[in-house]
Curated annotation (Swiss-Prot):
One of its GO terms (biological process) is phagocytosis. Keywords: Autophagy, Cytoplasmic vesicle, Glycoprotein, Lipid transport, Membrane, Transmembrane, Transmembrane helix, Transport. Belongs to the ATG9 family. It comes from Dictyostelium discoideum. The keyword Oxidoreductase does not apply. This is Autophagy-related protein 9. The chain crosses the membrane at residues 99-119, 140-160, 386-406, 421-441. Residues 599-620 are annotated as: Disordered. The gene is atg9.
Length: 699
């Protein structure tokens, strides 16, 4: 198959050194550059116990060795397509998902146009008997308003571009399907249930997939797929982006929406990265930063000004799309819009470096029930009392209408009450009753906010120092609700962000341009076989980049390079949990944690032998309320390190024991166990018998 036939993503394998050098020179994305950071990790079935654990039986997919393929000149794009294919669950699922998305958007616009232009509502709502036929109420010869015509033209251009992308993706996905089937030996049925770890384990065994590194590893693949996203995670973590609304009384509101995300990434990625997804060399030149900063500011303002012209149409489209998407759900489940979900800002706060989207989504999914239980631990008795009263009044009337409707169909369809039939009142009353009942406090609910927060932290890996020991307070709850908000609030913000985003781009983000350029320049390193990446994703320079309050060994004074809330440490541990085969022999952080864990275990054993004030492995809590003891009793689901972190008892237990180890590790044990708890719901659950500190000893 020729280069043209393969869609331009493949190059024939070249054994000649001159040809190899040609590819390296022309496509740095596939070659990378040599540096001291990173290193190859040779993987085989014989010396890698992580892969052995993946084998459920002797017929595991891993028994079939991948075959060689032609060298690929844009390995980032190829691996991203491979991952998206895995996430989309195969060719047919991706095909129909994209097709239905196209058809749905077209249907929304055409149906709305039909309702606005061609329906004669004067005849439709007339009271003449018999009612007019449908053809009398529809007039396809009616003129289309100018504003709607402009909207339809803009939408048509957008829809045609999506259609072109759809046909282009068919060819790409077909090639990726062949790669899965012929090279990785994974068929369409297995792609529905296979773990990404197993896909990675097969990818790294494909001969000569990367022409400048003999063996890729899981970290190389993650860094290629998330080459750009790691920079965004770092920018959010270090609070570099100015996302405030530049209006009086709104300047303290900082939020991220889908519209703002798209605008920000479009502004940055097309400016900073080349066509192969590699950061341009000029951004690593300190003498060019002033010029690049001015250019980025102009780019923000230009995109913001263009956004002002498209704002009415995007706002209009989102509004009608919301109506068609949620009307049926609002009718059948009125309370669903008042369910809660993590805000986009919270998602970026929780997202860890080199954490692929499906892993991250799994963490969020596991956290929802516990987060809701935490919020419900702060009931408003007054609101509940009012809601119960309203529900009783309207529910009584609703019950009468339903009973009368069962007795007589004529009553429910024709009887007039203030010019409305009972069926209309049933719909309104049913909605009110559903909403008010969702606000009534469960009488059997037990107040245990600390326990629910601990379980939430297990999955979000997010616990600010200001929350420790205060999770029962309304102050912490209010801060938590900023991150965990109503769905309807999220949608309303998305709608109005279309109005605010252009002004944020024009007035707020340009103030961050210099800091953004400095961040990209200061935080770009070259990883062997991968090329220029965000140094936070390298997972090697812990002393310079880590958070010393979380045991990172950090002694650097360069504030722009530091991470907050142990982002780097948590990311390393989480990545190790998700990829046990990743070689970490030279990782300072994991070596330090291993030593800390051993000493901590020895210290705990000594404490247990010499003290009677322990329940299991837990030090006596500073308080002795019934809730605390119940929390201890239930803590076999939650590692005691997380309990200590949430209740703020870690330092108390250290003060009670003068022989406790005095590492510069702060609450590092909480971070270890946060990540280890991911294993509880993972593929490896059955493989690990010791899910807590024993896991760290085995790293």
């Amino acid at each position: 198959m020729s280069h043209e036939d393969r869609g331009g993503d493949y190059y024939p394998m070249m054994d000649d050194p001159e040809d190899r050098n040609f590819i390296q020179a022309k496509y740095p994305n596939s070659t990378g550059h040599m540096s001291s950071g990173g290193g190859s990790n040779h993987m085989s079935f014989d010396d890698n116990h992580g892969i052995e654990m993946l084998r459920d039986d002797e017929h595991s997919l891993l028994h079939e060795s991948p075959v060689s393929i032609p060298a690929i000149h844009n390995l980032d794009s190829f691996l991203t397509d491979v991952y998206n294919y895995f996430r989309g669950k195969g060719f047919m699922c991706i095909f129909f998902n994209d097709l239905f998305e196209l058809v749905s958007s077209l249907f929304v616009v055409l149906f709305f146009t039909f309702l606005v232009c061609f329906v004669d509502y004067s005849k439709l709502f007339s009271e003449q008997m018999p009612p007019p036929a449908l053809r009398e109420s529809v007039n396809f010869s009616a003129p289309i308003p100018i504003w709607l015509m402009v909207f339809l033209v803009i939408f048509s251009l957008y829809w045609l571009s999506k259609l072109f992308s759809f046909f282009s993706s068919i060819k790409t996905n077909w090639e990726i399907s062949s790669f899965y089937k012929n090279t990785l030996k994974i068929n369409e049925d297995d792609i529905q249930t296979i773990e990404w770890r197993e896909v990675v384990s097969k990818i790294v065994l494909v001969p000569r997939l990367c022409i400048v590194k003999e063996n890729m590893n899981a970290l190389d693949i993650a860094n290629r797929i998330m080459r750009k996203e790691n920079y965004i995670i770092g920018l959010i973590n270090q609070r570099i982006l100015n996302l405030s609304i530049p209006f009086p009384f709104l300047r303290n509101l900082t939020f991220i929406t889908k519209t703002l995300e798209w605008s920000l990434m479009y502004s940055l990625f097309n400016y900073i990265f080349d066509e192969n997804g590699i950061i341009k060399s000029e951004f690593q030149d300190p003498t060019q930063r002033k010029r690049l900063s001015r250019g980025l500011s102009r780019r923000f303002m230009t995109i913001g000004i263009l956004g002002l012209f498209t704002t009415p149409f995007i706002f209009f489209f989102l509004l009608i799309n919301f109506f068609f998407e949620y009307a049926e759900e609002l009718k059948n489940r009125p309370g669903s819009l008042f369910s809660r979900e993590w805000s986009p800002l919270a998602r970026w706060e929780f997202r860890e470096l080199n954490e692929l989207p499906h892993y991250f989504q799994n963490r969020l999914n596991l956290s929802y029930s516990h987060a809701n239980q935490y919020v419900e631990s702060f009931p408003s008795q007054m609101l509940s009392t009012i809601a119960k009263f309203i529900s009783f009044l309207f529910g009584s009337v609703l019950a009468v209408f339903i009973v009368l409707g069962i007795v007589s169909d004529h009553f429910i369809m024709n009887y007039q009450i203030f010019d409305r039939t009972p069926i209309w009142y049933i719909g309104i009353l049913g909605t009110i009753v559903a909403i008010t009942r969702s606000l009534i406090v469960d009488e059997n609910q037990v107040f245990q906010p600390a326990k629910h927060m601990a379980r939430t932290v297990q999955n979000t890996h997010y616990l600010p120092m200001s929350w420790v020991g205060k999770t029962h307070t309304h102050k912490v709850r209010d801060e938590f609700l900023v991150l965990f908000e109503y769905r309807i609030v999220d949608f309303v913000r998305d709608i109005f962000s279309v109005l605010f985003t252009p002004f944020i781009l024009i007035f707020s983000l340009p103030k961050s341009s210099q800091a953004i350029i400095d961040f990209f320049g200061n935080n770009t390193v070259v990883l062997e076989g991968v090329g220029p990446i965000c140094q936070l994703g390298d997972f090697s320079n812990i002393r310079k980049l880590g958070d010393n309050s979380f045991g990172s060994l950090n002694h650097s004074q360069n504030k722009i390079s530091l991470t907050n809330n142990a982002k780097l440490e948590k990311s390393i541990i989480n990545f190790k949990c998700l990829n046990p085969e990743w070689n970490t022999d030279n990782n300072e952080l994991l070596q330090n944690l291993n030593e800390f864990s051993k000493i901590k275990n020895n210290n705990n054993n000594n404490n247990n032998n010499g003290s009677n004030n322990h329940i299991g492995n837990h030090s006596q809590l500073p308080t002795t309320s019934v809730d605390d003891f119940q929390f201890i009793h239930d803590s076999h689901y939650i590692p005691h390190e997380i309990i200590d972190a949430v209740l703020g008892t870690h330092h108390h237990s250290q003060q009670s024991n003068n022989n406790a180890p005095r590492f510069k590790t702060g609450r590092v044990d909480q971070n270890i166990l946060n990540a280890v708890n991911d294993l509880h719901q993972s593929f490896y659950e059955s493989q690990y018998k010791h899910k807590n500190d024993n896991f760290v000893n085995s790293i």
